Curated annotation (Swiss-Prot):
Positions of post-translational Phosphoserine modification: S520
Keywords: Acetylation, Cell projection, Chondrogenesis, Cilium, Cilium biogenesis/degradation, Cytoplasm, Cytoskeleton, Developmental protein, Differentiation, Membrane, Osteogenesis, Phosphoprotein, Transmembrane, Transmembrane helix
Domain of life: Eukaryota
Biased composition (Polar residues): 490-505, 516-525
S-S pairs: none
Tissue: Ubiquitous. Expressed throughout embryo.
Positions of region (Disordered): 1-55, 464-546
Species for this entry: Mus musculus (Mouse)
Matches recorded under Pfam families: DUF747 (PF05346)
Gene that produces this protein: Tapt1
Protein name per UniProt: Transmembrane anterior posterior transformation protein 1
Claim: Cytoplasm is one of the keywords in the record: yes
InterPro entries on file: Tatp1 (IPR008010)
Length: 564
């Protein structure tokens, strides 16, 4: 039996030799686990067996090392900035522009403040002398005979009007009690004083914008040629309007100085801090607006005027405080930190404001040199032989700085704070006056030299020799072209020096002196025959582009920070 079984086993295996492996594989396939009792079955090695095994191992390795791989990728990941070279170069230039803004802005501010100082010193030094010379000519006119149809030149008439307005407003300011105003303001709450100070700033800008129009109307009405048809209310009403304006503006500046004095004398300095924080609110109102070059020039002029006015207000505050403490020099050192804090906050606000305005509007720092050249052009053109207007008036139109109200207030404060008694005191006053004249002359000489340099660097000499005509802005003048031809033989430097240093000669009667050159300053004094020409010129101006030259930007839109 055993032999049969043994013999049958190979027979079965031999008879089913071909099916043996399949049966074995099928049995193993049917019983993969072997009932769970035997050892783990071994898989048959087929095509792609090792590849699938490697995939499983890779998946298992990736699942285990995903965090390490992420960290290594983050630590070793690279990038190339060369793909955005233009963008990064532009960002770097913006940084460099912001770094240059403080230097360029302060150069403009420094030049502009000395321009305002020159116009301000003119009221105290040269204006009284010019008024004296005009009155002397008026008194001695019968000795020379009436060879001229005019008693006085237009510039002399304007000087006399300025002097009379200054004297009348000075005596009117004596009826305003500074001490009562100080105690009235000091009794108010801090928040109310803060609101009052903001209202005074707005009112000061409005007064400055409209005040020069009143003064220009007075000057033009008083000096208008008699041959032209007059359509105005007369010189006397314009004169009273000018006196009223200067008086009200002087009172407004006095209230500003009194409020600042109360802030200085407060115990906890809270009001002074609030008033300084008002400057930073100005950043919010200016930085996020769209500005062009002309608008920025306009705002820069306003900042120059505001900074110079603040300096004069601080001087008035120091004079009043020193008077209260009997001119004790120790008290000056008590005021010195507060004065420095106010000045530093003003400078910081201007720098931050201009830096971000130039950044957001893609304006380069070189634009401030153009602004400086434009201000220098005003100074040089006012020193020419036949200038259109006085220099102090050109500064008022350009920056909105009107020196008459501020001069009236300063004279009132100085005369009430300093008592002049004895011959020695009067001698000191005379020496101080001659010192002011020397300072004015020195300042004018330095400013004139620097202005000529800035005009040459900006290549604006041709505009000096061939200025645009004032009567017809849209048409070229044949007279200016004929005058410009013989000057081409000389060098520009010789022409510039000759035109600046030459004194104004006697004008003929047929030459009409024009006070204002802008189209918005035409008064109701034109003859009927010229009305059609003016309407045609106005229609031509409407079709022009909205952008203007920097030399045409004045203080007429300085409050709105916009240019039509």
């Amino acid at each position: 039996m055993a032999g049969v079984c043994d013999a049958a086993a190979p027979g079965e295996g031999g008879g089913g030799g071909a099916d043996g492996p399949e049966r074995t594989g099928r049995g193993e396939a049917e019983q993969p686990g072997g009932g769970g009792h035997g050892p783990a079955p071994q898989h048959t090695e087929t095509l792609g067996f090792y590849e699938s095994d490697r995939r499983r191992e890779k998946r298992r390795g990736r699942a285990e090392l995903s965090l390490l791989r992420f960290l290594s990728a983050e630590l070793t990941r690279g990038y190339f900035l060369e793909h955005n070279e233009a963008k990064y170069t532009e960002r770097r230039e913006r940084v460099y522009t912001c770094m240059r803004i403080p230097r360029e802005l302060e150069k403009l501010m420094f030049f502009g403040i000395f321009l305002c100082l020159d116009a301000f010193l003119y009221v105290f030094t040269l204006l009284p002398l010019r008024v004296f010379l005009a009155l002397f000519r008026l008194l001695t006119l019968p000795c020379y005979g009436l060879r001229d149809r005019r008693l006085l030149q237009p510039a002399q008439v304007c000087d006399i009007l300025k002097g009379v307005i200054l004297v009348i407003c000075y005596f009117m300011m004596h009826y305003v009690d500074y001490s009562m105003m100080y105690h009235l303001i000091r009794g108010q709450s801090v928040i109310k004083l803060y609101i009052i100070y903001n209202m005074l700033e707005v009112a000061d800008r409005l007064f400055s914008s409209f005040g020069q129009d009143i003064l220009d109307a007075l000057y033009w009405t008083a000096t208008e040629p008699k041959e032209r048809k007059r359509a105005h209310i007369g010189v006397i009403p314009h004169f009273f309007m000018a006196v009223l304006y200067v008086f009200l503006h002087a009172i407004l500046i006095m209230v500003q100085a009194t409020t600042l004095n109360v802030a200085f004398n407060s115990h906890n300095k809270s009001l002074l801090t609030i008033m300084m924080s008002n400057n930073f609110v100005e950043i919010k109102g200016s930085v996020f607006k769209k500005f062009e070059k002309n608008n920025l020039f306009q705002m820069s002029n306003s900042d120059i005027k505001e900074r110079f006015t603040n300096y004069v207000l601080l001087l008035i505050v120091c004079l009043r405080n020193m008077e209260q403490f009997s001119w004790n020099p120790d008290h000056l050192w008590v005021l010195f930190p507060d004065v420095c804090m106010v000045i530093a906050s003003e400078i910081a606000v201007d720098i931050v404001k201009h830096a971000f305005i130039t950044k957001f509007n893609d304006i380069t720092a070189d634009v401030y040199s153009e602004y400086r050249a434009s201000l220098a052009f005003d100074l040089v053109s006012s020193r020419q032989k036949n200038a259109y207007t006085d220099y102090s008036d050109s500064v008022a139109r350009r920056m909105g700085f009107i020196p008459l109200p501020l001069a009236v207030l300063l004279i009132r404060v100085v005369t009430s704070s300093i008592k002049v008694q004895g011959i020695l005191s009067y001698a000191c006053v005379i020496l101080f006056y001659f010192g002011l004249i020397s300072l004015k002359i020195l300042n004018s000489i330095v400013l004139l030299g620097k202005s000529c340099q800035y005009v040459k660097e900006a290549k604006m000499e041709e505009k000096l020799f061939n200025p645009p005509p004032a009567s017809t802005p849209g048409k070229p003048s044949s007279k200016s072209q004929s005058k410009g031809k013989p000057s081409q033989g000389l060098s520009t430097e010789e022409n510039l020096s000759a035109s600046v240093t030459s004194q104004p000669g006697h004008q003929k009667e047929n030459v009409i002196p024009l006070l204002v050159t802008s189209n918005s300053d035409q008064f109701l004094t034109t003859p009927d025959g010229d009305e059609k020409d003016i309407t045609q010129e106005n229609s031509e101006l409407k079709h022009r582009s909205s952008k203007k030259d920097l030399l045409e930007i004045d203080r007429f839109t300085i409050c709105g920070n916009r240019i039509d």
